Amino acid sequence: MAELLGIYKCAKCGNIVQVLHGEKPPVMCCGQGMDRLVENTVDAAVEKHVPVVEKIEGGYVVKVGSVPHPMGSDHWIEWVELTSEDGMFIQRQMLTPSDAPEATFKTDAEKVVAREYCNLHGLWKG
């Protein structure tokens, strides 16, 4: 069964999707169910993957890791997402290997959660 705002990856082709509406049926790709990605479950350097959220005037800056995550053509952060605790605000910033591992979001939401996706080490939440 699909989870609202869940991130799913196809084990066959590597497609990644996020469920924005509905909770049924299971998310399918390549004729099979997609795997739900669970945050912070890959064995990797936590200090380089857990997003760090900083409140700034008019919004937030999300830095990937307390130690900056490497950004190279073979290992990088693909995107950073900020969601309000109530789920009413969702914004994602796509990154390239030449970008810094951070993103700025404009919102007046008081309580937020950040997630990021590393091309090698999966989904992380902070």
State what each model feature region is.
Residues 7, 26, 115:
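Residues immediately within or flanking Cys/His clusters that coordinate Zn2+
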Residues 10-13, 29, 118:
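Short cysteine-rich clusters marking metal-coordination/redox-active sites
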Residues 16, 32-33, 121:
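Cys/His-rich metal-chelating microdomains
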Residues 19-20, 35-36, 124:
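Short, non-ligating residues that shape and space the ligands of small metal-coordination modules
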Residues 23-34:
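Cysteine-rich micro-motifs
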Residues 63-64, 101-108:
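Exposed aromatic-hydrophobic patches
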Residues 64-72:
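Short amphipathic, basic-aromatic surface patches that mediate peripheral association
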Residues 119-126:
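Short acidic/polar inter-strand loop motif in beta-rich domains
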